[in-house]
Amino acid sequence: MGAKKVDLKRLAAALPDYPFAYLITVDDGHRVHTVAVEPVLRELPDGPDGPRAVVDVGLIGGRTRQNLAHRSEVTLLWPPSDPSGYSLIVDGRAQASDAGPDDDTARCGVVPIRALLHRDAAPDSPTAAKGCLHDCVVFSVP
């Protein structure tokens, strides 16, 4: 059985509620590097497997670019506006282009591999009744 694909329509519908995100990369020493970004979902022409999109995170700096040269897997984390709200998390593969205005910056796009809403389960919720600590809504299509 293959991996599920991200439901791009649900991801696109959720994004207007989240004005900014953190782009999270990892360096060779396994240290996390986090930068604030204002991502935009851009549709791409349909591929053989259906709809495609890239999350355009805009310009990135030298350290993020160095991390991506060794590890293209990244996470985008949009925090909730309210502590009881959902965080939006997108895992994906990033690619930097050389389209920055100088040698230290580049444009970055992330192809979503997994997307979900995540928060702590409320103590009286059906999720907590099942013994789960977290309330997750995964954006996937079969």
UniProtKB/Swiss-Prot annotation:
InterPro entries attached to this UniProt entry: Split_barrel_FMN-bd
Domain of life: Bacteria
Classification via SUPFAM superfamilies: FMN-binding split barrel
Protein name listed in UniProt: Uncharacterized protein Mb0449c
Species: Mycobacterium bovis (strain ATCC BAA-935 / AF2122/97)
